[in-house]
């Protein structure tokens, strides 16, 4: 554990250990992954956070790191509120660590998870060329495995997972189809597969083409599922993904949909995509055109950036410049830099599902510098790609 979580002592002042904005709030808890060694690529063992998600009961954070580990952190809220001399380092509250054998594509909390019910302490994880696994982080055991098999009889990973609100099914996205696995029976094969594109979809139905990249269930109708694809298309399905597709549209910017978020009233859908500086807003009651775009997102990256709603008609999102921004309707009303002196991508901003005044913020990357190789002849000198360490943190903010 000491090797996994190293305090970045010489950069504490840069890593936001005090109030940075009276509007957004302040850091009350933090886990820093950081080192200050110097090494030459391509060997890159240094660790940093990729993303994080609150559990449905708001008690635990599940985070993904560069070493392909999923870590469950039980957030000590009572200790956070008592800490007055800076944010509490809650790295000792690691309750479970799962090491994936391959690159993690996606993960999702069990929708009925409650910390005081050990049988419900589950999350699903999908990795490259591996079955989808259902893990109980209390017992540390693999409760079940679910198989997505391609035409060559090989396991496939899913880029998006979503439990239905009743906890009965796990939905997994695939290319031109999505699969439903029954959690209660534990059957390894999908009990239903919905084809979204191809000859099995009649010409009079909407067709959703591409590798499915993200899901989002409507908060006002738990059976309405929004599906995004890496082909820049979004589809709306009733009954948790059954055909026919009710609506389908193409986003105007970006290089593949990476995140979908419904507004509180379930009428507008926020769409984030790769390599796009704008978050698009669509009204599903009238999808002929995009309603408006949230300008200044700073999302020009292939990295998946997870954003969230905050209060009515407000959205919080990180960017590649190390800042978190708040929009009210389509107006940018607040901007807070959270990564110190470094322009790092803030990959996750998520409100606690029980108390929206508490936010989870996640960022991290390697820090690079370039030096000339003096051993080469002067006319053939080359620049060495060196990384000097990592700057990364998983933080809990309070308004």
Swiss-Prot record:
GO terms for molecular function: RNA folding chaperone. It is found in: Cytoplasm. Interacts with gpa1. GO terms for biological process: telomere maintenance via telomerase. This is Guanine nucleotide-binding protein negative regulator 1. Keywords: Cytoplasm, Repeat, WD repeat. Gene3D superfamilies: YVTN repeat-like/Quinoprotein amine dehydrogenase. WD repeats lie at residues 44-83, 105-145, 150-194, 207-247, 252-292, 296-337.
